[in-house]
């Protein structure tokens, strides 16, 4: 059965140049998407009834009103064969009324509709991939009423003597060139980076991350979140994707969003505290809030997590910044970022298995001591005023999130946090004297750095001193000379403005290479990022 031929002729006429996707046109997806996807909960067990029941439940539970306005179909929705004209066909058993009918029904209820395809010759589930049919598939999806495309990366093999990374780039670039010609470009979710997220060597991963923001609006960057029937620890799976996301903050900006995968609030392997933590962390990252759960069966506690207005407001903040690590201890992470209107966000995670009590000085938040900061707990709404520090008690795997209002006289924020090697996870450490090195992060102020607008890095342990370049990296009294200025690039390198050498774990400083693991670093949110 040819399910698309009659619809395609109407679309060809509107495939005209109008706008670009990605960072060149941030208005296409100005804030992270919110909605539902079937994969982590149901995998290939999807059908028309599931999506109708899900949409109905999203309306009755208030999720649509809260902002969850997307319903996305993942793999296995299609027939195993293309039609006679090579167009894609839906599985008529799973979708007896057809995808166009389903899309119209969902849109009439207030939802946007997304769909899944693959850059290879087959999808991950063995269904027809888009390779060689990209323009036709884009036309098909638009004709069906689809406005969001998740493009996976299974079964991609190099062509024309290209490397594997070059092949992925060519295919995703080709899709981008097609989508940007559309009158209404589809939101483009790229899965390419996930196929290069090898912790043994991150260089190829970063090569891919360098180009995905130019082609699409968001990218699935690493491992899949644990599916409902999967083996292993769901919490460990969340922490793996959380860690990967902390390595990529420099890429996120208006028009491009890092995607650490789905929210899984009904996973049986998670405690309620862990479900709250995943939501709080994803919101702090301004990550997509795409729920993969049985929506009609969510408990009142799970729904309360997903409908938290304050955390949704953080996630949807128009600045689009990603929270970054102000401090990392053996068990506790402290993350911060700025919000629209000048507020600061403070997020504190207890990764450990026991109760943790942590004191967070205002300096760790990039603020100055002695000012009356109004702090609101975004879980319970409690408000307090602090001038020096906040003391937080956290249960195992719990996360607290605070919104901090700054008085006008104390509105200056200095980007502050750890400088860590993204491959090893080790922190740049002021070792006293003039020595500087990389050590396991331990939550010490010798590992927390202030980064000025001019590129001076000062350890909180002695802010009169600066990271200094020369024959080796050192910490010396700040003289604000050029050898104490550092430029942070989108590739993750930290280059000394005087020597033009790069900070390097293991040797301290060396000739700048191309995204070498030893030279790629995470810095605090708010630091100026150079193109390269």
UniProtKB/Swiss-Prot annotation:
Glycosylated residue positions = 47, 91, 121, 201
Signal sequence extent: 1-21
One GO cellular-component annotation of the UniProt record comes to: extracellular region
**Root EC class:** hydrolase
Q: Which residues are catalytic? A: 152, 210
Keyword hit for Transmembrane: no
Mind listing the UniProt keywords for this protein, alphabetically? Answer: Disulfide bond, Glycoprotein, Glycosidase, Hydrolase, Lectin, Secreted, Signal
Localization of this protein? Secreted
Ricin B-type lectin domain location, by residue?
Answer: 410-531
A Pfam match? Ricin_B_lectin
User: For this protein, what reaction is catalysed?
Assistant: Hydrolysis of terminal, non-reducing alpha-D-galactose residues in alpha-D-galactosides, including galactose oligosaccharides, galactomannans and galactolipids
Reply yes or no: does the keyword Glycoprotein apply: yes
Task: Give any single GO term for biological process.
Answer: carbohydrate metabolic process
Looking up InterPro entries in the UniProt record yields:
Aldolase_TIM (IPR013785), Glyco_hydro_27 (IPR002241), Glyco_hydro_b (IPR013780), Glycoside_hydrolase_SF (IPR017853), Melibiase_C (IPR041233), Ricin_B-like_lectins (IPR035992), Ricin_B_lectin (IPR000772)
Task: Name the Gene Ontology molecular function terms of this record.
Answer: alpha-galactosidase activity; carbohydrate binding
Its Enzyme Commission number? Answer: 3.2.1.22
Disulfide bond sites? 44-76, 124-154, 427-441, 466-478
Family to which this protein belongs:
Belongs to the glycosyl hydrolase 27 family.
Role noted for this protein: Hydrolyzes a variety of simple alpha-D-galactoside as well as more complex molecules such as oligosaccharides and polysaccharides.
Q: Which PANTHER family match?
A: ALPHA-GALACTOSIDASE A-RELATED, ALPHA-GALACTOSIDASE/ALPHA-N-ACETYLGALACTOSAMINIDASE
Protein's UniProt name:
Probable alpha-galactosidase A
């Amino acid at each position: 059965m040819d399910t698309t031929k009659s619809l395609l002729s109407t679309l060809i006429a509107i495939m005209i140049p109008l706008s670009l996707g990605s960072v060149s046109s941030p208005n296409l997806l100005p804030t992270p998407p919110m909605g539902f996807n079937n994969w982590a909960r149901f995998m290939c067990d999807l059908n028309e009834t599931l999506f109708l029941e899900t949409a109905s439940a999203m309306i009755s539970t208030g999720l649509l009103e809260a902002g969850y306005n997307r319903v996305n179909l993942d793999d296995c929705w299609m027939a195993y064969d293309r039609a006679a004209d090579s167009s894609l066909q839906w599985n008529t058993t799973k979708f007896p009324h057809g995808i166009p009918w389903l899309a119209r029904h969902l849109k009439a209820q207030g939802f946007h509709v997304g769909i899944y395809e693959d850059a290879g010759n087959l999808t991950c589930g063995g269904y027809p991939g888009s390779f060689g049919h990209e323009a036709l598939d884009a036309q098909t999806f638009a004709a069906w009423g689809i406005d969001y495309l998740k493009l996976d990366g299974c079964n991609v093999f190099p062509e024309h003597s290209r490397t594997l990374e070059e092949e992925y780039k060519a295919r995703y670039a080709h899709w981008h060139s097609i989508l940007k010609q559309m009158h209404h470009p589809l939101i483009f979710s790229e899965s390419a980076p996930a196929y290069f997220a090898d912790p043994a060597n991150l260089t190829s991963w970063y090569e891919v991350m360098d180009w995905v923001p130019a082609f699409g609006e968001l990218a699935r960057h690493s491992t899949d979140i644990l599916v409902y029937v999967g083996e292993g620890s769901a919490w460990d799976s969340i922490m793996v994707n959380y860690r990967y996301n902390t390595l990529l903050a420099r890429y996120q900006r208006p028009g491009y969003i890092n995607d650490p995968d789905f929210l899984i609030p009904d996973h049986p392997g998670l405690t309620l505290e862990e479900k709250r933590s995943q939501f709080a962390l994803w919101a702090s990252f301004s990550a997509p809030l795409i729920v993969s759960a049985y929506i009609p069966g969510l408990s009142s506690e799970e729904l309360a997590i997903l409908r938290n207005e304050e955390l949704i407001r953080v996630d949807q903040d128009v600045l689009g910044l990603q929270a970054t690590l102000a401090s990392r201890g053996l068990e506790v992470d402290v993350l911060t970022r700025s919000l629209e209107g000048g507020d600061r966000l403070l997020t504190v995670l207890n990764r450990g298995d026991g109760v943790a009590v942590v004191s967070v000085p205002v300096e760790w938040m990039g603020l100055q001591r002695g000012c009356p900061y109004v702090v609101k707990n975004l879980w319970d709404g409690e408000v307090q005023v602090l001038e020096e520090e906040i003391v937080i008690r956290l249960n195992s795997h719990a996360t607290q999130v605070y919104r901090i209002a700054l008085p006008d006289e104390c509105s200056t924020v200095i980007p502050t946090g750890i400088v860590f090697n993204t491959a090893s996870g080790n922190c740049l450490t002021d070792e006293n004297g003039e020595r500087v090195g990389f050590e396991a992060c331990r939550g010490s102020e010798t590992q927390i750095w202030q980064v000025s607008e001019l590129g001076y890095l000062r350890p909180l342990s002695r802010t009169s001193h600066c990271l200094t370049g020369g024959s080796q990296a050192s910490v010396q009294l700040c003289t604000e000379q050029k050898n104490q200025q550092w430029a942070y690039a989108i590739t993750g390198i930290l280059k000394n403005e005087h020597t033009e050498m790069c900070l390097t774990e293991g040797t301290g400083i060396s000739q700048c290479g191309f995204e070498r693991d030893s030279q790629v670093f995470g810095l605090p949110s708010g630091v100026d990022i150079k193109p390269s």
